[in-house]
Amino acid sequence: MSKRDEVHEKLICSFCGKTQKEVKKLIAGPAVYICDECIHLCGEIIEEEYERETEGTRELLAPKEIKTLLDDYVIEQERAKKALAVAVYNHYKRLDTSVKTSDVEIQKSNILLIGPTGCGKTLLAQTLARFLNVPFTIADATTLTEAGYVGEDVENIILSLLQNADYDVEKAQRGIVYVDEIDKIAQRSDNPSITRDVSGEGVQQALLKIMEGTLASVPPKGGRKHPQQDFVKVDTTNILFICGGTFTGLDKLIERRVGEKTIGFGSKVTGEKDKNYNQSLQLVEPQDLIRFGLIPEFLGRLPIIVTLDELSEESLVKILTEPKNALIKQFQKLFEIEGVNLRFTDSALATVASLAMKRKSGARGLRSILESCMLDLMYEIPSQEGVKECVIGEEVIKKKEAPMLIFEQAKKQKKQA
């Protein structure tokens, strides 16, 4: 072995112990050496740490900017978008480590969304979580039960959030939880036909603890707790809870309180039915929700009450076409992949909106109507050659008639003419 080879054998990486021959590069420092592999590994570790640090300290958008982002995906509901933008901004500003609040403790303000089915409650919460880049989960209040009953514990909500945060506890503790159908756990003693079982109030009691802020013991695999299993501790103090519900009949309770007559010759007529409903909801007060069946302690954990308007037919037409991820745009993209230009007439869009209004399903019903009407077409189009354009008219929606197909040959003939 030559002297040069002996020197190469003696030079080793101070971190991994590999010799100079075993690596591509070996960089020398004062009495230490580092190889190219260790440099690459260190770079990855530093990058991961940097991403984790910047994720929690990224610049928070101002309320106006948050609302602008919501405008791209949620049609109308201006009042609700403003209220949510301010509430979310204040919540995450409170968690901002750069803002000194040691002299004054800023408490968390959870949010209650009230509005009919398909008005955008869930979409608002989902859109907020996506732009804020925080873990998000949706829980159904109707599946929750208090201890001792068959069903899910409230801690399973936190487990779902933890799973969406890839079991990063610190990240989950800054997340957003949306609890849907919250009105279904209300006690309605004045109307026994729609009263939930006795566990309804128990669920409210269990929820208010995690909503206010507690150190929740979460079973990593879900299910009911038992003493032998290990638990993950999650502090819910900084988790933002958004609860949503339709609260059917709440408008009548509000009208009764403000003294408006809803039937008879002396009834106050203010226009369309949805206008009356929207005007009534805007007058909601905590006492109305307590009469509806929410216990005062639970309502106290939801200081911000936001009402959403019932959508009109014109609003539904806008929802079909205007948002960034509008349904019509989604279908057009699917057809574009097949090389077909998909077009809906104005009357077809109005018919879809009208059907959704009749079904009383709001924006949620638009997709099911379109999917039903487009099924045969989406089945046939990939197998048909030469189709360049497809026009969906009113009769396609109403009577499931075949749409107008324009073939490539016909287009060529038009150009020649």
Swiss-Prot record:
Domain called ClpX-type ZB: residue spans: 1-54
Alphabetical list of InterPro entries matching this protein: AAA+_ATPase, ATP-dep_Clp_protease_ClpX, ATPase_AAA_core, Clp_ATPase_C, Clp_protease_ATP-bd_su_ClpX, ClpX_bact, P-loop_NTPase, Znf_CppX_C4
Listed CDD domains: RecA-like_ClpX
NCBIfam families from the UniProt entry: clpX, PRK05342.1
Any one Gene Ontology cellular component term annotated for this protein: HslUV protease complex
Keywords assigned: ATP-binding, Chaperone, Metal-binding, Nucleotide-binding, Zinc
The organism's place on the tree of life at top rank: Bacteria
Cysteines joined through disulfide linkages: none
HAMAP family per the UniProt record, alphabetical: ClpX
Upper taxonomic lineage: Bacteria, Pseudomonadati, Thermodesulfobacteriota, Desulfobacteria, Desulfobacterales
Cleavable signal peptide: none
Annotated GO biological process: cell division; proteolysis involved in protein catabolic process
Protein name (record): ATP-dependent Clp protease ATP-binding subunit ClpX
Physiological role: ATP-dependent specificity component of the Clp protease. It directs the protease to specific substrates. Can perform chaperone functions in the absence of ClpP.
Residues the record lists as binding Zn(2+): 13, 16, 35, 38
Listed GO MF terms: ATP binding; ATP hydrolysis activity; ATP-dependent protein folding chaperone; protein dimerization activity; unfolded protein binding; zinc ion binding
Residues noted as binding ATP in the record, renumbered to the chain: 116-123
Species annotation: Desulfosudis oleivorans (strain DSM 6200 / JCM 39069 / Hxd3)
Family of this protein: Belongs to the ClpX chaperone family.
PANTHER family documented for this protein: ATP-DEPENDENT CLP PROTEASE ATP-BINDING SUBUNIT CLPX-LIKE, MITOCHONDRIAL, ATP-DEPENDENT CLP PROTEASE ATP-BINDING SUBUNIT CLPX-LIKE, MITOCHONDRIAL-RELATED
Subunit structure and binding partners: Component of the ClpX-ClpP complex. Forms a hexameric ring that, in the presence of ATP, binds to fourteen ClpP subunits assembled into a disk-like structure with a central cavity, resembling the structure of eukaryotic proteasomes.
Pfam (any one): AAA_2
